[in-house]
Amino acid sequence: MGELIRLEKIGVEYQTRGHAPKKVLDALDLTIAAGEFIAVCGQTGCGKSTMLRLILGAEKPTAGRVLIDGQELPRPDRNRGYVPQKYSLFPDKTVLDNITFGPEMEEFGLLGRLTPRFRTRRREFRETAHKYLRQMGLQESDANKYPDQLSGGMQQRVAIAQALIMRPKILLMDEAFSALDPATRADMQKLVRTLWAETGTTILFVTHNIAEALYLGTRVVLLGKENPNASGRVIFELAVPDSARGASGYPRREEIERMTKLIEDAAMGGRLEVEMAEFAG
């Protein structure tokens, strides 16, 4: 696969009133090929979420360049989907309307929704939304429910469907499963990895959990800081080959132990979670 994303000497610095500028990322270099599943680990405050926002186009670097398909990063568009840790569904819209809102607004805006053509396209959008509902393991009866009638896991499935209906080339997921209970979290991991295998979408998934990263990723990228006052950068990368996985798709326990040791040694004392029993195959 060819190169899709390139981060070149990225620096991000925030100005704060009455304090010295806070540098979050410094000299960060990373290249990602089309179709990769990149799991991003690192201690709190090392710039993982900032990196996702840069790729999304929601934030600009202070230094360096973000390239998508060889082009300087444009504004956010449908080619980059985003699933945050706390899903942001519209509470006054049904599940179906939450999913179709993005493509409807992109194609028609507010005024365009008054045209006859919108009514035709809306039927098409809703048919597509039903397909993603099924793909996410939701029932047809869930389509007309409101977010507060759904469990946390079901709401997160809707949030992923919101992103997928835009058919992004790149899907950015920022600790998207961290608030879920272990059983739901495991279900969502399997679901997302299956979607990745079927669609070939390039995914960047931020997590604090090493075992989760090793299960999901084809490559684990560790961000870290040399000291508490330093800024984040890539300090370690590890490919996760298919040969390390058991029949279930999870890495075998001995492989998790081996790769976890490599990552922890590179983490320079940063706290990372390891919930091995839950993920080991």
Residue ranges and their predicted role:
Residues 146-150, 154:
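Conserved ABC ATPase signature
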Residues 41-43:
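The feature captures the beta-strand-to-loop junction immediately N-terminal to the Walker
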Residues 56:
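Helix-to-loop junction immediately C-terminal to a conserved catalytic motif
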Residues 112-141, 194:
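Conserved ABC ATPase "signature" region
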Residues 64-75:
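Conserved ABC transporter NBD signature motif
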Residues 165-169:
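A short, proline-enriched helix->beta-strand linker immediately N-terminal to the Walker B motif
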Residues 96-104, 112-116:
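Short helical segment in ABC ATPase nucleotide-binding domains corresponding to the A-loop/adjacent helical element
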